[in-house]
Amino acid sequence: MIRGLIRLGLMGAGIGYAVDRLLAETDKGAGPGAIYSMVVIEAPIERVWAVLADIEGQTRWMHDMKAVRILTDGPVGVGTIGEADVRIFGISVTDPVTITEFQPPTRFALTHDGTFKGGGVFELEPGADGTTTIVRWDETLIPPVLPHLGAAVGSPILSAIFQADLERLRDLVEAETAQPAETAETPGTETADLNLP
């Protein structure tokens, strides 16, 4: 029975390797592609940037990120190094990252330098009237083993995870943006009620 399991495992590894090589040939050396996500947030770009660029606060809306630490001193910007404890597909890894672009309030990019290589780019664009913000997130993650097969299998799942992360970002920003307005309206509403017959 053990020999049968070993043979089955070796056969699976061989098939996985062959499929990965076939996918690599199809990609013509381009490598696994980016995963694209987008959301529109009912808040000005500066408010969205403040939440998105709060590195240590990203665990509030990226549920796959369990903890994050900034490892370099000084303000966050190009060259800032950090690491995050991430859990996806039941696998926990420490993900060291380096910020490669930091252009408030429109662009934030980083590279993944750990087990999973790749990079991510957040682009923010104000909506037509300035009260909304369009957030685009392009993320490339390259698995350490069978990268093309891993990306082909994992991309649909990661796409759903990243889209859910952006939707949580939207909900968080919109809730925080609405709180001061609701508080400010409450006294005015009470005063207006006092003037009613």
Give, region by region, the residue ranges found by the protein language model:
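Short, cysteine-centered beta-strand-loop-beta hairpins and adjacent loop/turn segments enriched
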Residues: 87-93, 143-146
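Solvent-exposed coil/turn segments that connect beta secondary-structure elements
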Residues: 87-89, 102-104, 115, 140
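Beta-strand/loop substructures that line and gate deep hydrophobic ligand-binding cavities in soluble
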Residues: 4, 109-164, 169-171, 180, ...
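Hydrophobic ligand-binding cavity/cleft-lining segments
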Residues: 4-77, 184, 192-197
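Hydrophobic/aromatic beta-strand elements that line small-molecule binding cavities or substrate pockets
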Residues: 37-39, 70, 95-101, 112, ...
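Intrinsic-disorder/low-complexity, polar/charged segments enriched in Ser/Thr/Lys/Arg/Asp/Glu/Gln
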Residues: 32-40, 81-83, 94, 107, ...
